[in-house]
Amino acid sequence: MKNTYYITTPIYYVNDVAHIGHAYTSVASDVIARFMRFCGKDVMFLTGTDEHGQKVEKAAINQNIDPQTFTDKTSQNFRDLMVAMNISNDDFIRTTENRHKKAVAVFWKKLLDNGAIYEGFYEGWYSVRDEAFYDESEINEDKLAPTGAPVEWVKEPSYFFNLAKWQDKLLEFYELNPDFVRPISRRNEVISFIKSGLKDLSISRTTFHWGIKVPNNRKHVIYVWLDALVNYISALGYPDKQSNYAKFWPANLQIVGKDILRFHAVYWPAFLMAAEIPLPKAIMVHGWWTNEGQKISKSLGNTIDPITLIDEFGVDQVRYFLMREVIFGADANFARNNLITRINSELSNKIGNLLHRIVSFVYKNNDAKVPLIKSGVIDKIYELPILKTAIKFAQENILLMDKTEINKILENIINLAEDANIYITNEAPWNLKTTDPDKMLEVLYSLLEVLRYIAIMLQPFVPNSANKMLDQLGVSKEERLFKHLVRDHALKAGSNILEPSIIFPKFN
C-alpha cells in the first residue's frame, strides 16, 4: 500500500483578486497536507494559477500589455498569498509553463487517438466571465447564466469532446464510488446534472488567441477548462512514468469550490476515462463566504483582503478562524466580531491562558524543569480521565480528517483545553505546594503532558504558534509527529522548559 498522499487546490484564475475564498481553500488544503505529513505520509501538495482564456486576453488588452506580462504579474499575487498564509505547497503550477503545455498536447492527442474528439461547429451561449458554455435551459430572461454572469451567443468552428458517450459510465462510477464527491448534497447535484442528459462539449475556440494551440490545427486554441484541469497531472510530470506522476497519481483529494463543481465532477472524470487515466479518489466541495451576511462582490465594495486580516490579527489567528468557523462543505459568513471572539475565547483564554498558567508555575516553582517523577507514576498519570481524553481525541482526529471534518478536530482540541482548565482549578497545584508537594508534581506533569497533546494536534492549523508551544514545553523537534502522542514519548522528567511568553494575545 502506497504511503503517499496527493492533495490539490483548484488553480486560481489570474483575473481574480486574491480574496478570503482563495485563502480559505488554500488553508484548508494546507491543513490537510500538514496533517498527513504529521501522520507520516509522503505528501505532494499542489496549487497554482490558471492563466489562459478570453477573459485574460481582454484584461491584458485593456491594460495595453501582452497576456504573458499580465499573467506574470497577476500570478505573483497568488504566490504572495501562499507565503502570507504560511501555505506549505510543494509545487506551484502555472498553465503558461512549458511543462504544462507539453502535457496538455499529449493529453489532447490521447483523446484524439481514442476517438473522443471530433471536429464540428459550435453555436450556443458562452460566458466569458465563467469561461463556460451554457444550455438554453440554463439562461434566464436577462441573458444571465446561473452564476449571474452575462452570456453571449457564439458561432464558430470547434472541436468537440464526446461527453454524451460517457453519461452511463459516469453514473456507474458514482454508483460504485459513493464517497467520490463530498458532501452528499454536492454528489446528488452532480448525479442530477448527469441524469438530465449530457451533451458533447465544445473544447476549442477560434475567436481569440491566448491559449494552448490545438496540436493538429493551430487555428484553434484549447478550451481553457480542458487546459486547466490537466494541471493536476502536468505538475507531476505526465506522461513520464518515471516521474512523480507514477508516484502520486491518482490524487487522494482534490479541493474545489461549489462554483466549479461541474468541471471537476463531470468533465474531468469523463476526460480521464477517455484518456484511460485513473480518476482521483475523492473531490471535496466547499461553500462560499459572505461578509456580515451579505454576498461578497467588488461592486458592493465588501471584499475581504486576507493580507489585511493577517497584518491586524496574525496568520495563525486567521488560519484558525477560517477552519473553526465553518463546517467544511457549507457556506460561511465572515463577521469581524466572530473572528475576535474566536481568538479571545478559544486561542487566548482556553489554550494560551492554560499554557501560560502551567508553564509559569513550573518555571517559578520547579526550577524550570518538567517535574521529576518516576516511570510508574507516569503510568498512573496516563490512567487519569484527562489523559484518556487526550489519547481518545488524538485517535479520533485521524478518523475525522478522513471525513474532512476539520472543524470537529478543532472542537476536540478546544474541549480538551476546557477539561484541562477545569482540572487545574479543581486540583489547585498552588495549594498542593505546601500540603502535598508530590501530588503537586503529578498534577503539573499531567497538565504539561495534556499541553503536549494539544500543541502537537494544533500544528497543522496554527504551525508557528504550535511550534512555540512545543518549544516552551521542551519537546524536541524530532518528537512532534502524531505517532508521538503516546505514553512512550511522554515528556522526559527533569527536562528543561523555556521561560513562558504570551503566544495568543487578546484583541479588542
Curated annotation (Swiss-Prot):
A motif ('KMSKS' region) lies at residues 295-299. ATP binds at residue 298. A motif ('HIGH' region) lies at residues 12-22. Pfam families: Anticodon_3, tRNA-synt_1g. CDD domains: Anticodon_Ia_Met, MetRS_core. It catalyses: tRNA(Met) + L-methionine + ATP = L-methionyl-tRNA(Met) + AMP + diphosphate. One of its GO terms (molecular function) is ATP binding. The gene is metG. It is an enzyme of class 6 (ligase). GO terms for cellular component: cytoplasm. This is Methionine--tRNA ligase. It comes from Rickettsia prowazekii (strain Madrid E). Belongs to the class-I aminoacyl-tRNA synthetase family. MetG type 2B subfamily. Keywords: Aminoacyl-tRNA synthetase, ATP-binding, Cytoplasm, Ligase, Nucleotide-binding, Protein biosynthesis. Gene3D superfamilies: 2.170.220.10, HUPs, Isoleucyl-tRNA Synthetase, Domain 1. GO terms for biological process: methionyl-tRNA aminoacylation. Its EC number is 6.1.1.10. It is found in: Cytoplasm. Monomer. Transmembrane segments: none annotated. InterPro entries: Anticodon_Met (IPR041872), Met-tRNA_synth (IPR014758), Met-tRNA_synth_2 (IPR023457), Methionyl/Leucyl_tRNA_Synth (IPR015413), MetRS_core (IPR033911), Rossmann-like_a/b/a_fold (IPR014729), tRNAsynth_Ia_anticodon-bd (IPR009080). HAMAP family: Met_tRNA_synth_type2. Is required not only for elongation of protein synthesis but also for the initiation of all mRNA translation through initiator tRNA(fMet) aminoacylation. It comes from the Bacteria.
